[in-house]
Design a protein with these regions (language model features):
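Fe(II)/2-oxoglutarate oxygenase catalytic core
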Residues: 1-179, 183-209
Length: 209
């Protein structure tokens, strides 16, 4: 799919109080090891954990609170319109509160899959269309942890990776939001000091026609 805007940003959109409230609330909840889609919810073997952490190493908490969605949804609607995507979406998945501590990261990935959700429930038959990442800590509170995008869509003629990477510096101020199509490739580089807290939400709809 060809698009003119690969992401839309809102610098410092969320108030410091909201960010701090989410951090405090999430830190009271049960923390789990971050996974990628292929591992599901089953108990992992040591070798599987080792293999997983080559791709993704972070800790997270799942949140489903109305007060969080109420704050975030207006930005999803605005970005969807202003960026010119105009994707039809119906509902949001659970919010993923992520902690990136020293040497933690998430290598190159996209948030969508080649098939819609097959498990019975409200997500059945839907795909991830829009992704949102919210910066809960200020960029001055940690080093490393850069959010980067790859806009090549894996065109074989675009072999010089450096020319097609975009480091999203717009995310650095506390409370900033970036919304992007879920098929866009991105990564979070290793944090070298401090802790980066983020909130990620995926917004679902019927497959593109």
């Amino acid at each position: 799919m060809n698009i003119s805007n690969y992401y839309w940003h809102f610098p410092g959109a969320l108030t410091p109080k909201f960010c701090d409230d989410v951090i405090a609330y999430a830190n009271q909840q049960e923390e789990v090891m971050a996974r990628t889609g292929g591992y599901g919810d089953r108990k992992l073997k040591k070798e599987e954990i080792k293999d997983l952490k080559r791709k993704r190493n972070s800790d997270l908490v799942w949140l489903n609170d109305t007060w969080i969605y109420k704050e975030l949804h207006p930005y999803v609607h605005e970005a969807n319109a202003r960026a010119g995507w105009n994707f039809d979406w119906e509902r949001s998945e659970s919010c993923q509160f992520t902690k990136y501590k020293h040497n933690q990261y998430y290598d190159w990935h996209c948030d969508s899959w080649d098939k819609p959700y097959e498990k019975e429930g409200p997500d059945f038959g839907k795909i991830r269309k829009l992704s949102m990442t919210c910066q809960l800590t200020d960029g001055s509170e940690y080093t490393g942890g850069e959010l980067e995008f790859d806009f090549r869509n894996y065109d074989p003629h675009m072999r010089d990776e450096a020319k097609h990477l975009r480091r999203a510096k717009e995310i650095l101020p506390k409370g900033s939001i970036i919304v992007f199509p879920s098929f866009v490739w991105h990564r979070v580089k290793p944090v070298t000091s401090g802790t980066r807290y983020s909130l990620v939400v995926w917004h679902l709809g019927k497959p593109f026609k």
